[in-house]
Design a protein with these regions (language model features):
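Acidic, S/T/G-rich, low-cysteine, solvent-exposed domains in lumenal/extracellular/periplasmic regions
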Residues: 90-285
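Juxtamembrane extramembrane loops of integral membrane proteins
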Residues: 1-133, 137-140, 144, 158
Length: 285
């Protein structure tokens, strides 16, 4: 047993003390149990490693341990909602994001806005991830009211071949935040052995959201990224650029050609660099 003023560390041999294994519901491969009062959080051996995009595994134990300590020592919870009902990415495909949020003491819920009739009062943030269909007028108004009441929104556009006409309400929410949807898919002509022209590794802007990623040389990888720009007539929100392409990229506006696996820059397309993500912040807050 080892300890300091904050933490006591006790190691048990589960073969010699099987009752402890049953009491703490440990995994046979090995488990670290964090306990504070009546609150417990288990981190198994398998949870300490995470696969990267190249198929290798890297150690995430420090992150998992930090989350576990936070889970058992903090009584403060933050509630966030993921919008459903418009073909958004299902929660079953967002297990890593959900796990990380819950590890940071967030309570994650799904929200069918048309059914509920409002964004819940305890919503500290609303996520809209990859919707295939537009919101209706009533839902749009509810979200705008939520934003006007200091709500926070994370919106990631999906791909729709009719995006120029199919998303007027989503476009209006972005316009309120000072961002314009240019209805074009980012193309990076310079191919590599790792990525095709539709796969973008963007450059970072200057904002607290992305500064740490830039400082630690962590890459963001995007596919079917949508070109955005500043909405010049927005008055309440100030957009700050987070992600952009190289100068060689362009925005393909002929989505029918793109669906047929063909693309060629012409006068109707948008010249790079393209802006791919913004943080819209209220000027008065």
């Amino acid at each position: 047993q080892r300890q300091n003023s904050k933490i006591s560390l006790v190691e048990y041999d589960m073969m010699k003390q099987p009752s402890m294994a049953n009491q703490y519901n440990v995994d046979p491969s090995g488990t670290v149990v964090f306990e504070s009062g009546d609150t417990k959080k288990n981190v198994s051996f398998y949870q300490m490693f995470f696969p990267d995009q190249m198929g290798s595994y890297y150690f995430t134990g420090e992150e998992k341990f930090t989350q576990a300590i936070l889970n058992v020592t903090s009584t403060e919870k933050h509630t966030v909602y993921f919008l459903t009902g418009h073909g958004e990415i299902p929660m079953t495909e967002l297990s890593t994001l959900r796990s990380n949020l819950e590890g940071a003491n967030y309570v994650v819920n799904e929200l069918h806005l048309y059914r509920e009739g409002k964004v819940p009062d305890d919503a500290e943030a609303l996520f809209i991830l990859g919707p295939q269909n537009d919101l209706n007028n009533a839902e749009t108004e509810l979200i705008k009211q939520y934003l006007n009441g200091n709500g926070k929104l994370f919106l990631a556009l999906g791909f729709n071949q009719n995006m120029a006409t199919a998303w007027p309400n989503l476009d209006s929410i972005m316009a309120m935040l000072g961002v314009k949807d240019e209805h074009a898919v980012a193309i990076e002509p310079k191919q590599t052995t790792l990525f095709d022209p539709l796969t973008i590794v963007p450059q970072y802007g200057f904002h607290t959201i992305v500064n740490k990623l830039d400082e630690t040389s962590l890459l963001t990888v995007m596919s079917l990224a949508i070109s955005l720009n500043v909405q010049s007539d927005a008055t309440d929100y100030e957009p700050t650029l987070l992600l952009k392409t190289t100068n060689q990229a362009y925005g393909e506006t002929n989505l029918e050609m793109l669906l047929n696996s063909r693309t060629q820059k012409d006068d109707n397309d948008i010249s790079g660099p393209l802006n791919l993500a913004y943080a819209g912040e209220n000027k008065d807050r």
